[in-house]
Amino acid sequence: MNILMALSQLEVTGAEVYATTVGNQLTKRGHTVHYVSDTLTKPFIGQFFKLRFNKRSIPRRFWHVAYLVYLIKKHHIQLVHAHSRASSWSCHVACKITGTPMVTTVHGRQPVHRSRKAFHAMGDKALPVCEAIEQQLIEELDVPASQLTVSRNGIETQAFSPTEPPKNTKPIITIVGRLTGPKGELCFRLLDECLDLEQYDVRVLTGSAMEARFEQFANQASFPGYTNDVAQVLRQSDLVIGAGRVAMESLLCGRPTLAIGEAISIGVIDQNNLSHAMATNFGDIGPNILDIDFSSIAQEVEKGLSQPSCDPAVTEAIGNNYDLENIVSQVESVYQDVVISKLQKEMPILMYHRFIDNEAKKGTRGPYIDIKLFEKHLQLLKRLGFESLTFEDFANKGTIERLNPNKRYFMLTVDDGFVDNYELMLPLLKKYGFKAVVYVVTGETYNRWDVEASENPDKPFPLMSNEQIKAMAESGYIEIGGHTLTHPFLSTLSYKEQKHEIEQNKLELESITGKPLTSFAYPYGDLNENSKEIAQELKFDFAVATNSGPLALHQDLYQIRRIAIFPKTSALGLWRKVRGNYVFRKAK
């Protein structure tokens, strides 16, 4: 995707660290990420455009919106991700003008006034970084809960691993944070009222310029300035004082951590207060500024210094909840939610069954299509610039690959595994360069489920042999998927019976093809919760239904909706089905 990250800060902030960390990871995953901000200090990959969001006069705001519209159109931006109030306001208007999907990560409490309640200016989805912000948005700004998803700060956890505790002759206490605003007031009071600057080696790690009021501490505490090697500084510390990302990174390094932010003091982090710490972004979020009992801080400092390391269980919990890979995957999922919902378009997944080359092969039950008409389908798809994807592609690249701005994708699936798939379909796929996913029944040699049907029974049509299945899998054009042994209505079977049908089919196909299966198709599109549970248990990455499941395929990877193709689906009919909005129109 083409993504624009929007920030507004004049010094390094947690929002900037978040945006660049997530942005760089998105870039590594193949996305193109641009940045627009007043300043940008942290290392980033992509283009940076300077825009003074902090200049908020009416003419300036018009300029902000106009410039953002220009950037969106010039760089074919598919989604804007804002990270501050100033940037989100202008981005919201620009995205309204251009019809561009937008999300906003909310890093702190929002001001409450009438205009803010009426005009949230957060785009299509807001991502509060903790539960306290989510609660405030709902209760004080009337933001619908459905528009909110808690998305925590993503941290490159591998860069902050525990080491042996330092052996400092004089305990090192490191305070990390800005010297401006409430954080600056907090730091000043810690130095002035709470810390014994003679007894401890106090170091203030900040990206802010030194304010005059801090000069009185220059001979008793050190102000080394900002560093890109934060982990090394944390590991050298006997106690770290900070909030937000600082506290998380310190705990990942195994250091005793006093979580105190611009709202409240959590205390030295342990398993008892960890949940409260996470909910308040480690003290940064609360209804009041500096609602802190400073007289108790000295005791907390002593408590922290008495511990050589933090509880390993706390370090593990931080890793599980803030791991960058997991957070970015969640962000990608939100991007897909917003883009698909806003544009009302989804990649078409087509469902075929049999292919015929003469009238005698027509059936009475299972859908079929004349091979000449199928070729017209492929010709149309080629002419429209489509490329094919398989579920193996999704397993390797993620479902967000379907939103690649330079591609137009569809997926071709074929159920049951009839001989005509090998004899008639495969040559045409090779001719036009398309791939397909073929779901194969292995416990039958013909379509017995149709032949023995109580109503309108069909003629027998042969299924592929093991040799043909193997040849299909090795062709480079076919992904083989599971489709049970005997093509039953799964919802009518017990859990044990379902598992036997699905598992045995999977084992047989993997034995034939020599590689693990990625996806499974429920016969008739019939399933229940047991069916989905078994598909996951057997390590299928995806499972497809027919006309059930969410309209956006990524929202339930074990009940993916497909578009059925019938004998009379003409080229014009196919064009309507592959435009992208078919499932949305059909659902209305």
Region annotations inferred by a language model:
Residues G14, T163-P165, G286-Q336:
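A charged, aromatic-enriched C-terminal amphipathic alpha-helix characteristic of glycosyltransferases
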Residues A82-S88, V106:
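Short His-centered aromatic/hydrophobic patch
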Residues K96-I97, P101-E131, Q135, D142, ...:
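A conserved, positively charged/aromatic
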Residues A132-I133, S151-F160, T180, A209, ...:
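Short beta-strand->alpha-helix junction loop in the catalytic core
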Residues I138-E139, S146-Q147, G154-K170, G181-G184:
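Acidic anion/phosphate-binding donor-loop and adjacent secondary structure
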Residues I172-M210:
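Conserved catalytic-core segment of nucleotide-activated headgroup transferases in glycan assembly
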Residues L343-T413, V419-D420, T492-K588:
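C-terminal active-site subregion of NodB/CE4 polysaccharide deacetylases
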